[in-house]
């Protein structure tokens, strides 16, 4: 009778476990999020994950490729170049619809902020994922989406944002306020981004596609002609100001060399690197030590 009772109890536990689901570990591989919008219905959007060996849960590091990019190829290259970083984070590489991210007038009209938020929410449920201190990094068009996520998201999972060769554009900040994209991509609603974050921007002094000094791009279209940008140093100051800096904009770098000028606010919690000899290839000047140093920063404000 005792054996039968134990057997029934075991069966009951199995049934309960099956009904509520057993917490699982995230593993390396490809995953999808299903979304519908004007261009697609029930469309499976891909992202790729690299999970390092770790005895403790690790935070997420999400990378967004530039226009025309490929997430799987980005993962191979980025993890090879940044091996120490790839041991400290669960690395995620999301694929943009039509190799694009929906900013102003790009090919993609997809709900991309919601896509990134869905990835974070989904992966945070795994036992080997730390739900806090997530990092969102993007290059060019991907960096523009990083800015938009930083502007609009209400998810508090992110602690660090990294934007490479795309400071704020003039639709995202009109000189007075940060702007939500809106369903029609008209950027008319003023919003207040979450505070207490860290932000790193890297821009090329000779960039013509995303002009360092601001103004219209020579190649990126917008609804009213060419996409205009905020001055890169001004853009960094606007973020620093929002995140708690109360002083005047820096007019001189805090560190300088022939290769790179550094503008540091809030003890490095908000930092801008001006690559003096580079253009839209400024991301090539970003080293793993630079990333690791920034990711060790915190913003208590």
Locations of regions flagged by a protein language model:
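C-terminal catalytic-base region of ester-bond hydrolases, centering on the histidine
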Residues: 215-301
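Short substrate-entry loop that stabilizes the transition state in hydrolases
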Residues: 55-101, 169-173
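A domain-start/cap signature at the N-terminus of enzymes
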Residues: 21-60, 89, 108, 132-162, ...
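The feature captures the conserved acid-bearing segment of alpha/beta-hydrolase catalytic domains
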Residues: 159-160, 166-248, 264-265
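Bacterial N-terminal signal peptides that target proteins for export
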Residues: 1-9
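Bacterial N-terminal signal peptides
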Residues: 9-18
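Alpha/beta-hydrolase active-site loop
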Residues: 106-127
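Acidic beta-to-alpha connecting loop that harbors the catalytic carboxylate
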Residues: 67, 97, 205-208, 213-216, ...
